Amino acid sequence: ALELADDEIALCADTTVALGRRILGKPSDRDEANSFLSLLSGRRHKVITCVAAKKQNQVKVKEVISVVKMKVLSFQEIETYLDSGDWEGKAGGYGIQGPAASFIPWISGSYTGIVGLPLNETMGLLSSLKYPVFGSKNG
């Protein structure tokens, strides 16, 4: 276990994509990324990011759910995106903050949550643990 000083905070976050009841994590290879993108093409899906912060014996957790609409993707769009390698390490096989932004006509929720760290909610967690989010010791 990680040892923290009394004034230190451990922060962690992870993101996954849900299409109905199916969870699309980080694809293990190009073929799986292709499968994920083909499934998401033309559909709405949820992006779920969970953030946790721990200070001493206090643990605070926040789940942020956003809805994302992906346009219908052509074979060429998928192949070009896969060739870019941008899908690697990304839940659902795409990153909204990169070239795949052009695939997303609409979102409802937290853009930074979709990217992988919902900033507003993270600041709220840190503030609730009396961590100086703006550089002030007074919070």
Regions from the PLM with identified roles:
Residues 1-139:
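Anionic-ligand binding patches
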